[in-house]
Amino acid sequence: MSVESKKADDFCLCPKFEKTFGILGKKWNGLILEVLLAEGDQRFTDLVQKIPQCSDRVLVERLKELEKDGLIEKVYMRDCARGFYRLTRCGEDLKKIMKEIHSWSEKWILETDKN
């Protein structure tokens, strides 16, 4: 057995790491979390305005998934049928990670047209 195939056979991704990247790497999730981290609680309409490239249908799906994963929660106010979304403690813990991603992207990602 060669050194390369032995190394490949010995390597195994951590299931928790895989799940984390499955959540954070899903299109729009990072942007949704970034808006909530940067600007706090948001109504659905606020998120629609701040992430205009994401369709309403997909945004609803992502919000439900992030809620199921424990990163955000939907809070309903007594006097209003519509609620707002906010980060849970778990979601708030991403602040440092997102700051590091910002630093990395400033250093390595070239600005391109938004088209």
What are these regions (language model features)?
Residues 34, 67, 102:
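A cross-family signal for key residues in well-ordered alpha-helices
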Residues 59, 63-66:
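Basic amphipathic alpha-helical segments that dock to polyanions
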Residues 25-26, 40, 70, 91, ...:
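Glycine-centered flexibility sites
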Residues 2-5, 14, 86-115:
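Amphipathic alpha-helical dimerization/coiled-coil segments
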Residues 11, 15-58, 78-86:
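N-terminal helix-turn-helix DNA-binding core of bacterial DNA-binding proteins
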